[in-house]
Amino acid sequence: MNKMALASFMKGRTVIGTPDEETMDIELPKKYHEMVGVIFSDTFSYRLKFNWGYRIPVIKEHSEYTEHCWAMHGEIFCYLAKYWLKGFVAFQAAINAAIIEVTTNHSVMEELTSVIGINMKIPPFISKGEIMNEWFHFTCLVSFSSFIYFASLNVARERGKFKKLMTVMGLRESAFWLSWGLTYICFIFIMSIFMALVITSIPIVFHTGFMVIFTLYSLYGLSLIALAFLMSVLIRKPMLAGLAGFLFTVFWGCLGFTVLYRQLPLSLGWVLSLLSPFAFTAGMAQITHLDNYLSGVIFPDPSGDSYKMIATFFILAFDTLFYLIFTLYFERVLPDKDGHGDSPLFFLKSSFWSKHQNTHHEIFENEINPEHSSDDSFEPVSPEFHGKEAIRIRNVIKEYNGKTGKVEALQGIFFDIYEGQITAILGHNGAGKSTLLNILSGLSVSTEGSATIYNTQLSEITDMEEIRKNIGFCPQFNFQFDFLTVRENLRVFAKIKGIQPKEVEQEVKRIIMELDMQSIQDIIAKKLSGGQKRKLTLGIAILGDPQVLLLDEPTAGLDPFSRHRVWSLLKEHKVDRLILFSTQFMDEADILADRKVFLSNGKLKCAGSSLFLKRKWGIGYHLSLHRNEMCDTEKITSLIKQHIPDAKLTTESEEKLVYSLPLEKTNKFPDLYSDLDKCSDQGIRNYAVSVTSLNEVFLNLEGKSAIDEPDFDIGKQEKIHVTRNTGDESEMEQVLCSLPETRKAVSSAALWRRQIYAVATLRFLKLRRERRALLCLLLVLGIAFIPIILEKIMYKVTRETHCWEFSPSMYFLSLEQIPKTPLTSLLIVNNTGSNIEDLVHSLKCQDIVLEIDDFRNRNGSDDPSYNGAIIVSGDQKDYRFSVACNTKKLNCFPVLMGIVSNALMGIFNFTELIQMESTSFSRDDIVLDLGFIDGSIFLLLITNCVSPFIGMSSISDYKKNVQSQLWISGLWPSAYWCGQALVDIPLYFLILFSIHLIYYFIFLGFQLSWELMFVLVVCIIGCAVSLIFLTYVLSFIFRKWRKNNGFWSFGFFIILICVSTIMVSTQYEKLNLILCMIFIPSFTLLGYVMLLIQLDFMRNLDSLDNRINEVNKTILLTTLIPYLQSVIFLFVIRCLEMKYGNEIMNKDPVFRISPRSRETHPNPEEPEEEDEDVQAERVQAANALTAPNLEEEPVITASCLHKEYYETKKSCFSTRKKKIAIRNVSFCVKKGEVLGLLGHNGAGKSTSIKMITGCTKPTAGVVVLQGSRASVRQQHDNSLKFLGYCPQENSLWPKLTMKEHLELYAAVKGLGKEDAALSISRLVEALKLQEQLKAPVKTLSEGIKRKLCFVLSILGNPSVVLLDEPFTGMDPEGQQQMWQILQATVKNKERGTLLTTHYMSEAEAVCDRMAMMVSGTLRCIGSIQHLKNKFGRDYLLEIKMKEPTQVEALHTEILKLFPQAAWQERYSSLMAYKLPVEDVHPLSRAFFKLEAMKQTFNLEEYSLSQATLEQVFLELCKEQELGNVDDKIDTTVEWKLLPQEDP
């Protein structure tokens, strides 16, 4: 080393010896910024060690795609020149000279240090810079990445939601994929044109034409479409499919960057090219490479490199085809939701390739279930239907995989369905009705058994495609495209069903007319009401007039008027067709269906006509006698049994006696009624008779006792209380009366703590079960680690210590080696003018193939076909050398210097060869010096932006109306927000703390004092609180927006990037830093980190103590900033809740928000021509508000309620029309009373209830609850704390269990643990919900969900209960249970209930009074009996014929018997007449006439009863349909509240 130190360039340099390499690696780099290490293995072998990037190039050997030279300011720079310019070669020459001198005692220092380095001729190129080149490739790659995300997301969503059903309706598999493909191909071509224009217009690609870029992008886009299809098939979850497609594209596309640095093996390149992002990146690399050398990609160019681009085009086209084939393959092979999928080798079956006509399944007469043929539970089919079996079901079994094992939904079903009949499938919730319909429609596949439709097997795919042409299917759920209008939906599905284009418009008009949808035909489906969506779904099913109609609860959610219209439509279409439907409404099945099939727990119980079922399982007729105190039960019973010995007394109460009479004894009725007419002196006030209903049949089949159906009075009418089964009711009443009283159970502070704990538990459960949210959060944090991982990889690839041996074999051929690329011979140019044999001989001793030429022939630098050349000058005793290198050979200069050094030593007859290697120092602190910290800063930026993924759950609560439901149930806003914060803040703190721990101690490597560590933790806690509260503020302000965590996180990120850039530009000026930390909460923690780095930097530089103390003070000051922000944000939340939040029931003890008093506005309209009962109710409501002392204050008082909405603008230039939803409605609900609100869809029932709850603010009028003289918002401490509210929509959390819902609401309402457990257990037992108690809500049936909502509304014994269509979607058994509970709750005379419903049976069963609404106005109100007396003075005669051919003769006979009879409607064999009261009395004579007519015309059955409220309701609904158009309430528009009413 002393010899080396004599070199001229070593002046001023220090040479330090170390005992070993470890000392050199660890100690010296800390003291010396720039240092060169020399490690000798022996005398002739050594290794040079440099700091990375100081003396050697920053990359390894280049591949052909990387730029080796660049131009700057008119000069050309090449990477390999760094060896020469930065002194690497000088060190090498000095050390080699020293070794030679020590070995040979000859000094060659002058010869070696005077070697001149020359670059060979550089071919023309375009200089763009490597970073720009890589950024260009990355931009090209990600230009379509967002596309594949949205394509995968949309296709997966559409496939999961619509494809199966559209396939059932006749959509072909190819049509589905082609429609999406063509849609996205248009997008791809537009984007490809745009990208090609951009790339060829800006100085990036100069010599490659537009068509090449366009073709590459187009083929890549097509492959991405196919890849999106494949992802949507492989991954069912739309969100995951989109993310998987995006990550697939980015990852494999980034992997394509390896072609910029490595020459991959050909086979590996072809394999990786099966991944289209890799092939695209490689193609772009090829284009830029050829463009760099001024050739570009030009077609046709057979002699050039264009064939490589052609190969890329072919591989991208092949990738597209490859992905499409796998898409179609996995579409058939992967099991669907039911676990059904084709065999993996389905394509080897002959049936797949040849669409031969399958032999139809022949049905023989004896091919019936032997059980059914001998079972009297099944009515034999009349001979006229023999041979008309349209559907044959044989031993159909359907199994599902449940959590506890296999669940049998259907268990060996056998029966036939006949053409020309309407067949109804009946059964309890979960009986298997929908499963059977899904199997018949092809939506599902049976596990075992077979089914045929018109002798065509459903199990054969080819047959199924034929069957679907003739099937119309209405699923249980509404099915339509939300963004299309009603007309457009019908038009689309008409085309899917294959209706001829010429007939589409005519067919659409027919459906609109038949279902009375003219008023909604141009309205977007998303804005339709539930009943209107149901109409549209049914309309889609009957498009094309299919021969087979399969309808799953087609009239669910329809009002009676619409329901009767559907019945008429189906009756008209049943001739020569098959109609099979399911329903929960027994009356609908009784009237509409010719044959009923009962299922129970997946088994077939019975089948037959109504008369057969009623005779088999019915009780018979119900004779109800209303009595007074003079009535002697024994005498009356004896009288009845004289006429009908089989009569049984079923119910006895103080006011009523109910007897069951056998069906076959109707001939005895006239005499019985004649005697009853004479019993007025025995205490009989009036009597009524009703026939057995299918409800009773259903309950008897299920082994349940039934509540007596509402009776139809046929005698002198007085107020009637419907009598229920006294045993069941008394038991239910005992259960409910024993529930704990909760309204005064706890103090405000204790209740607040209990509510906080309940909300925190809720948030924890939601967080634990919302895997999607956690997955997104983990994904974002994972993305934050990507830059660090990439830096690690790049550090490994380009910066990590690598030992490179500079041997001639790197570039030059050996003597016995066959010529191969990229090795060449070494060119020796003799410029000495004499013989240089000694030098040549010494060079050959190094096993190098030489090519010797004279300088006069070539100078050695003009021919870049050689990897390197040595130009020899001087004379034999004093050689001088110049070395010329090919600019693409990065390590050429060190190799040639080694060759020259060994040649000189060989001249002195020494055979040893000097071997030199190069490596670099690997130091931890080099990371800071070289910017490795940038990746970790990115990690901190992302971490500070993830609070929206944690703190925005309130948006989903708001959109599901759960939040308002909690407020109505008594939850305080402060308890809600603080309860959420108890979970969100610790979670976010753990994330922040963990990431900062990693950042400080792993990436930065500096140690914090315990004091600073404590301050850091305090600051992190404050920032976690501040950012979570900020997120709460944003979620409140933008709660009506879509919950978009990613959008807000990205917004935070952009803000942080901008602020960080400003901080860097201002050199972290203290004032700017503090201001940004104060006003930008997401930057607070990052600014704190910057201060800590600054402090650590000052300590390392031994800065003055006063400067360090100043920074310490700043750090302590900034620690208080997030806590100040937290207080401000919490106050903002309080202000928002006070101004714009949901109405609260009582004063919030923390936010100090009092219930707001409503501003009552005078009603803009005066009532005109009101019914006298409605007018009396208005006066009573007004008196309840103004009278100082009332004997009995109503529980609910609604006075002059008026509600107006504004329609949404249809265009920018249109004006908003005002719609009136509620018009001058007044009513009172008394203590111990159930008031029913009935009305057509859109009549204003739900709006009325929402105004009472405070969810909707009335435009005018006032609501008073619990007798308060002010509004409900001004309650005192001794008044109600919460309402019992069951909304029309199920406001539930899908992933929480039923038990968790009940426990949450019990805590919110103030129940203690023991009381809550007692209440829950008793209510669950009363409604038979034990099996569903631990099941997630999303797995429950609609009926069970309604039960849960109902239980939540009555939990805690509220004094005011509001029920908005609570019994929708429930089977008769469930309805009976809820009716019993509701009746038992009102036994408490302090409690009042308001109920809305569409169904008269519900209202008559549970309501004390009813009010009917039409177009937002109250048309009538009163007790059930009062309304019957007032509007139902006529009688209804229904006759069911056995032979429809007798219609005319029968009609003539009826007019003879009842001259004023009016023919109402006719459903096939059912005839209905309205009879005036004078034609009917006396009833005994009327029944005598009917009995005689029954015998004469062989009638199946008849019933005579007073006109029901159903008919009254239908008449009023017709008024709404035909009313004033301007006044009609259109619920199909998305109304916007008046400006002053909602923020």
Swiss-Prot record:
Q: Name one GO cellular component term.
A: intracellular membrane-bounded organelle
What keyword terms does UniProt attach to this protein? ATP-binding, Membrane, Nucleotide-binding, Repeat, Translocase, Transmembrane, Transmembrane helix, Transport
Q: Keyword ATP-binding: yes or no? A: yes
**Positions with a binding annotation for ATP 2:** 1239-1246
Could you tell me which InterPro entries the record lists for this protein? AAA+_ATPase (IPR003593), ABC2_TM (IPR013525), ABC_transporter-like_ATP-bd (IPR003439), ABC_transporter-like_CS (IPR017871), ABCA (IPR026082), P-loop_NTPase (IPR027417), R2_ABCA1-4-like (IPR056264)
- Residues spanning the membrane: 83-103, 135-155, 185-205, 210-230, 240-260, 264-284, 310-330, 774-794, 890-910, 926-946, 985-1005, 1014-1034, 1046-1066, 1073-1093, 1113-1133
**Enzyme category, top tier:** translocase
Record-annotated residues binding ATP 1?
427-434
Function, in words: Probable transporter which may play a role in macrophage lipid transport and homeostasis.
Annotated protein name in UniProt: ATP-binding cassette sub-family A member 10
Protein species of origin: Homo sapiens (Human)
